[in-house]
């Protein structure tokens, strides 16, 4: 499937997903007596919000088609190349992995990987896809990522800019979750020790909670911590885009997700609550 087909399919599924959200909202309304009296969000407001997003996405997609040579998906492999492996049809859609990045992953060099990512980091150009492709070259991605987090106190100064290395930690663990990396017993035990250490630093700092929950999610440590406490941390990080991902991965059950939604609603954060409704 080409990139344009993937986008079109996702847009076509919006109505179906909105129906599921409507059912979740109706279930919530059935327990309205448990909600804060100040809760006044209506389905029409939610529907209007997502309809606006849908319209904007569809409009931009049509504009993309009108300005780019996608009609024939020219970036696909030509039929004349049919003699190549069938898997080559998708190769042009894969991100290019820089040789240095690939070499670091092949050598399982976590510290070198952190330094490299900090050096090339650009807020305007997300690295998720390239790192996801590169990390698959590592014989042991989970151990490499853990090495990077455990051993990094690196902050570049030659450029004169400060950088929060925790952003790289989160990126690496996001990718680890995405590729469903194998976690050995030794790596898991090391990660458990690090997670307890990081948990002690959380306090009321949402980004520390975000890193902690990624440790729990990426290294499959959900059973090592109290679920109620994990749910409280999810509330702390609800504003971050990764919140629902880690919530699902760490095993917060449906009952506690319901309580989380109620807490968000009572706190005047209905849009954040919607994220957890389906």
Curated annotation (Swiss-Prot):
> What keywords is this UniProt entry annotated with?
Coiled coil, Developmental protein, Differentiation, Flowering
Alphabetical list of Pfam families matching this protein: Frigida
Cysteine disulfide partners in this protein? none
Question: Which GO annotations describe the biological process of this protein?
Answer: cell differentiation; flower development
Q: Identify the domain of life.
A: Eukaryota
Coiled-coil residue spans = 1-36
Additional information? In cv. Columbia and cv. Landsberg erecta, either FRL1 or FRL2, but not both, is functional and required for FRI-mediated up-regulation of FLC.
Query: What PANTHER family has UniProt attached to this entry?
Result: FRIGIDA-LIKE PROTEIN 1, FRIGIDA-LIKE PROTEIN 3-RELATED
Question: What family is it from?
Answer: Belongs to the Frigida family.
Quote the function comment for this protein: Truncated inactive FRIGIDA-like 1 protein.
Q: What is this protein called?
A: Truncated FRIGIDA-like protein 1
**Annotated organism of origin:** Arabidopsis thaliana (Mouse-ear cress)
Gene that this sequence comes from:
FRL1
């Amino acid at each position: 499937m080409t990139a344009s087909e993937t986008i079109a399919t996702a847009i076509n599924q919006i109505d179906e997903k909105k129906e599921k959200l409507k059912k979740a909202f109706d279930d919530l309304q059935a327990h309205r007596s448990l909600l804060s009296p100040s809760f006044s969000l209506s389905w029409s407001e939610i529907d209007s919000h997502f309809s606006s997003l849908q319209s904007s996405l569809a409009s931009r997609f049509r504009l993309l088609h009108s300005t780019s040579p996608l009609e024939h998906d020219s970036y696909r492999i030509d039929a004349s190349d049919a003699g190549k492996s069938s898997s080559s049809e998708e190769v042009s859609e894969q991100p290019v992995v820089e040789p240095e990045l690939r070499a670091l992953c092949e050598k399982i060099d976590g510290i070198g990987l952190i330094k490299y990512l900090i050096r090339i980091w650009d807020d305007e150009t997300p690295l998720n896809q390239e790192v996801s492709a590169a990390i698959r070259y590592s014989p042991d991605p989970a151990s490499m990522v853990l090495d990077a987090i455990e051993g990094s106190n690196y902050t570049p100064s030659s450029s004169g800019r400060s950088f929060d290395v925790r952003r790289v930690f989160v990126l690496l663990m996001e990718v680890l979750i995405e590729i469903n990396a194998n976690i050995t017993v030794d790596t898991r035990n090391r990660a458990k020790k690090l997670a307890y250490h990081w948990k002690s630093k959380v306090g009321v700092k949402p980004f520390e909670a975000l890193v902690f929950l990624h440790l729990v999610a990426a290294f499959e440590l959900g059973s090592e911590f109290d679920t109620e406490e994990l749910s409280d941390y999810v509330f702390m990080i609800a504003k971050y885009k990764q919140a629902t991902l880690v919530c699902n991965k760490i095993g917060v059950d449906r009952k506690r997700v319901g309580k989380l939604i109620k807490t968000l609603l009572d706190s005047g954060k209905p849009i954040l609550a919607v994220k957890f409704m389906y």
